[in-house]
Amino acid sequence: MRIFLLLLLGLSCQAVASDRKEWATLTGCRHVAHKNDDGDSFHVRCGGEQFVLRLYFVDTPETNLTYGERTREQAEHFGATLDRTLKAGARARVFVRDTLREPFTVITRKAYAQGAGREPRYYGLVIVGGNPAAGRWLDEILVLAGLARVKGVAVNIPGGEKARAHAQRLRVLEEHAKQRRRGLWAPGPG
């Protein structure tokens, strides 16, 4: 029991320490297709390093029922059936792959994001487009397409935007997608 508590304490200290790391901006990153990718967690290669990136702020539908309760919660949020939700998860995975065909920028503190797999898994933000100053945030693109909900770990954005302000902007985009019936907000069978 004592070993378990020491291990748990060590892991929690590691998570806190990684949250204090400085932001790193990784340019020229590429999406690496992988069978376990989904819309909010996917493999990337930046320079010589490959890792799984978990987006801050958003949650895309699951692609299978491995996490059945989460998938049911997602379906309820969007007012959709489980089948439609799973199909939207598959669409989100393809949407991200297609959106990230060209090099993009990852902004990360390399804070550990728990998950299955052997590769490192870090929280981060993605700027789509070659120029970070002129690019668009992937989380915003996903929400506006109706393929993600505003949920998950939030963080103050480098450059000064507070987490609360960014999340509020995402909620406005989510309402816009809902009103326009985009993505999983669109009416469908079942």
Task: Tell where the protein language model's regions lie, with residue ranges.
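Small beta-barrel nucleic-acid-binding modules, primarily SNase/OB-fold domains
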Residues: C13-G190
